């Protein structure tokens, strides 16, 4: 008996297995460790390392240029003389198969040199950030140095693998081997809202005040930057200002002058002029004009907060954010605001006042925008739509969280066990398993729970509570 035919015009179904890619990568790593189907032996520092060509090609622009076409089919043993050190290459090989990069202050320079050699730009950037974050707590500000061009072959292939986030560019697309300066990096899509930005960016970098780290081929950290004097300052500033007008700022792998990079000043001002950084602590009191002082023997002024260099003191005034930009101050926490209405909304944080209430369910809010978002629950309005599956959401934050299901991203790893999570709040709840914290307390019976959902279930089952309201849990009966 045959199965019934599908009705005409019925919708199809596509199910995405978000863990499939990580499972495949894990299986490939297990095959590598067992030496199964490995088709190339890499000789790095005299040490043989077995691997799969397909994985190497997918992760490295250097290996793509070596193994592409028929010429790479017969390559069974590949020696890298004068290339990366074994202690720098081994972590990269593990990263290709596990998506986890292990860095320490001792191994980071070697990993950086190996990643540059293999044209793995995303790893190069991660090493730069790690090294910079390691030096900034010591009060040392690093500046870019002249970087040597990469030595591996860079013959342009006719085609290249598909580019994707978390994978390097093939030789034709790699900025590290191009002649022109690279284009500015696009913002991290995982840092689009403030919670993810705070976790991913602020926790991974001690500060963004210093310029990107430049590494010598020996892997030694570059020396501390210093302020130039006299003609040296004027010539450096003039050359850097002219280069900034011609095109974008070059990256850390290009040849840079010490004053050519552009980042954010330590005092919070955007860097729109050439600058130099030192590790000397300066007094941060006074107005922007008072904090600008002339450099000895030159016509340039430097900011005493962050050693920014400008052609005149008024130039620093426009860079340093002054108190006059935010005249409204909170008397309790000294926070400053540009508009009076923002200060009034902020005060409700201290007073606990919630003047805006929902006329349907009575829920109260301290900001009108929160009430407007809440009202969509009752009206059924869902203005934010997923372009992949068509699902709609009340809040844009819910849409951002939903999109991660399609991309398969899990950007939040547990620092204890390494388990990765799609959402920051899920990670916070998971960490309580390791810490033993149980912050949710049942008043009637004194029990503590690790998760709010456990408390809600307990209140419903044991105490007959109505937990379907955000205002409070109303216990209807006794235990």
From Swiss-Prot:
Keyword Zinc-finger: yes
Subcellular location: Nucleus
Region (Disordered): 143-190, 210-259
Tissue expression per record: Ubiquitously expressed with higher expression found in heart and placenta.
Protein keywords: Metal-binding, Nucleus, Repeat, Zinc, Zinc-finger
Domain BTB: 38-105
Comp. bias regions, Pro residues: 147-160
Any one GO molecular-function label of the UniProt entry: DNA-binding transcription repressor activity, RNA polymerase II-specific
Mapped zinc finger ranges (C2H2-type): 328-350, 356-378, 384-406, 412-434, 440-463
Composition skew (Basic and acidic residues), residue ranges: 162-172
Entry keyword annotation includes Nucleus: yes
Record field: compositional bias (Low complexity): 234-244
PROSITE patterns xrefs: BTB, ZINC_FINGER_C2H2_1, ZINC_FINGER_C2H2_2
InterPro entries: BTB/POZ_dom, SKP1/BTB/POZ_sf, Znf_C2H2_sf, Znf_C2H2_type, ZnFinger_BTB_dom_contain
Any one cellular-component term (Gene Ontology): nucleoplasm
A Pfam family assignment: BTB
An example Gene Ontology biological process: regulation of cell population proliferation
Binding partners and assembly: Associates with BCL6 through the BTB domain.
Function: Acts as a sequence-specific transcriptional repressor in association with BCL6. May function in a narrow stage or be related to some events in the early B-cell development.
Protein name (Swiss-Prot/TrEMBL): B-cell CLL/lymphoma 6 member B protein
Organism, as annotated: Homo sapiens
């Amino acid at each position: 008996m045959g199965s019934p035919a599908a009705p005409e015009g019925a919708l199809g179904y596509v199910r995405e297995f978000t863990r499939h890619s990580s499972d495949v990568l894990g299986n490939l790593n297990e095959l590598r460790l067992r030496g199964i189907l490995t088709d190339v032996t890499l000789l790095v520092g005299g040490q043989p390392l077995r691997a799969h060509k397909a994985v190497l090609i997918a992760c490295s622009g250097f290996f793509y240029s070596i193994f592409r076409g028929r010429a790479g089919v017969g390559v069974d043993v590949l020696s890298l003389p004068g290339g990366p050190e074994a202690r720098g290459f081994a972590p990269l090989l593990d990263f290709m198969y596990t998506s986890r990069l292990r860095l320490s202050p001792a191994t980071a320079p070697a990993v950086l040199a190996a990643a540059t050699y293999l044209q793995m730009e995303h790893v190069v950037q991660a090493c730069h950030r790690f090294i910079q974050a390691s030096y900034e707590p010591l009060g040392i500000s690093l500046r870019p140095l002249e970087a040597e061009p990469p030595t591996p072959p860079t013959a342009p292939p006719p085609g290249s693998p598909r580019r994707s986030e978390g994978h390097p560019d093939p030789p034709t697309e790699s900025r590290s081997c191009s002649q022109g300066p690279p284009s500015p990096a696009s913002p991290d899509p995982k840092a689009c809202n403030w919670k993810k930005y705070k976790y991913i960016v602020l926790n991974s970098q001690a500060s963004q005040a210093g310029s990107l780290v430049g590494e010598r081929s020996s892997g030694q950290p570059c020396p501390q930057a210093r302020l130039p004097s006299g003609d040296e300052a004027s010539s450096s500033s003039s050359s850097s200002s002219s280069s900034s007008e011609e095109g974008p700022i070059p990256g850390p792998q290009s040849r840079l002058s010490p004053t050519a990079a552009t980042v954010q000043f330590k005092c919070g001002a955007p860097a729109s002029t050439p600058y130099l950084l030192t590790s000397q602590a300066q007094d941060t009191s006074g107005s922007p004009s008072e904090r600008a002082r002339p450099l000895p023997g030159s016509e340039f002024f430097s900011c005493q907060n962050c050693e920014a260099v400008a052609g005149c003191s008024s130039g620093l005034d426009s860079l340093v954010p002054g108190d006059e930009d935010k005249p409204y101050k909170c008397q309790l926490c000294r926070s400053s605001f540009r508009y009076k209405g923002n200060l009034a909304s902020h005060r409700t944080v201290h007073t606990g006042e919630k003047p805006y209430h929902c006329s349907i369910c009575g829920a109260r809010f301290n900001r009108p925008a929160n009430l407007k978002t809440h009202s969509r629950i009752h009206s059924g309005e869902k203005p934010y739509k997923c372009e992949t599956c068509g699902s709609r959401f009340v809040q844009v934050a819910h849409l951002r969280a939903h999109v991660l299901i399609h991309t398969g991203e899990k950007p939040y790893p547990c620092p204890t066990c390494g388990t990765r999570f799609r959402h920051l709040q899920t990670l916070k709840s998971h960490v309580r398993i390791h810490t033993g914290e149980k912050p949710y307390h049942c008043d009637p019976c004194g029990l503590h729970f690790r998760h709010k959902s456990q408390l809600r279930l307990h209140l419903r089952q044991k105490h007959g509570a109505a937990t379907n309201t955000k205002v409070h849990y109303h216990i209807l009966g006794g235990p």
